[in-house]
Amino acid sequence: MADQQPEKTTAPATDVADSQPAVVTSTDTRKETTETAEPLPEDKTETTTAQPAVETTATQSGTAETPAEVQQPPQAEEEKPVAQQPEQPAYLAKNPALAQFFERLPAIVSSSGHAEMWGVPLKDSNDAPTVNVLIKFLRANEGNVKLAEGQLTKALKWRKEMNPSALAESTSYSATKFGGLGYLTVYKEANGAENVVTWNIYGGVKDINTTFGDMDEFVKWRVALMELAVKELKMAEATSVIDYDGEDPYQMIQVHDYQNVSFLRLNPAIKAATKKTIEVFTTAYPELLREKFFVNVPAIMGWMFAAMKVFLSKNTTRKFHPISNGANLAREFPSLKDQFPKVYGGSAPALQEGARTVNLSQDESAPAAPEQSKEQTKENKEEAAQEESKPESAPEQPKADPAVTAQEAPAADAK
């Protein structure tokens, strides 16, 4: 009876036969196949005497489940890389140069000793404001990581030494030297988007030597105005990363007005001040300019813009727009036209009435004038002498030299 039971238990043999019907030809063959293909069930069948057929079936089902259990750990291992992918943002995966730039950021911050740019604390690649800052420096250097690293390092060192935020917030500048020369406005679109505009009124220079004589003071005043504008860009509040090859909402518009300015002479003081300004702005404020408009520029000065195209990149010069009549400026911004001052074709008050500027203070020498008025005789003589001497000081110079500033200043913050 014990020898006949395996012959009656046909379920296991049938399973094997289904997989290889051409091989199974006899009962003996089924026995050999069962013994060869399923050695484990035979061992367990020997230990179980009450229901061998049932045990064999159970053993087979248990054996079938074992491979699935063995395959589970590899599946878990394959899921680990998927979980690690979010660690590298998409904008880094698409831009290897930007990823390399971020790898260098800790060393850059360490070597410069400063970790703030335009009000943005420099953190890591998961911080949108930080990413936007690095994108600007990388763009300015056409994707060259080494050059971008060098420029960012210099800019950070400069900010540490100069403290431009303090220049804009807590420093006062001479109204006599800089009053009426620079303004800041913010114009809102219907959708709430803001347009930051800086104005440089070169025709407002009263005395060349007074305004440009102290080069360091002039540069600080110019930086203070720029910092006010940068603050209005609100880069530290960014919640998304700008498209490296797309539009950049963190840029400003600049207007240079040359009304009543002559371009015929080059004063050494102006040349030195503007050259220094160009160096500072090119290094410390890359990719912050959207467009630059030169208004009230004489038609004969077209050579100035032709010269710029020789020395500046196409990416920079394409942002320059000369306009001979300043009253046509507002036409360039149809949706903002009413917010522009009347003198520029809009409906708003003059810049002197509605625009912001840097902190200005009267010179210490100004209050001394009333004390001299007590001695009318002496004062009259002095005033007469002064009035006679003024025509001899060539009043045409103030108009001539600021124009050269206009000629050179456009490149100051061109990028």
Swiss-Prot record:
GO terms for cellular component: cortical endoplasmic reticulum; cytosol; endoplasmic reticulum membrane; plasma membrane. It is found in: Cytoplasm; Endoplasmic reticulum membrane; Microsome membrane. Transmembrane segments: none annotated. Keywords: Cytoplasm, Endoplasmic reticulum, Heme, Iron, Lipid transport, Membrane, Metal-binding, Microsome, Transport. InterPro entries: CRAL-TRIO_dom, CRAL-TRIO_dom_sf, CRAL/TRIO_N_dom, CRAL/TRIO_N_dom_sf, Sfh5. Residues 1-87, 358-415 are annotated as: Disordered. This is Phosphatidylinositol transfer protein sfh5. It comes from Neosartorya fischeri (strain ATCC 1020 / DSM 3700 / CBS 544.65 / FGSC A1164 / JCM 1740 / NRRL 181 / WB 181) (Aspergillus fischerianus).
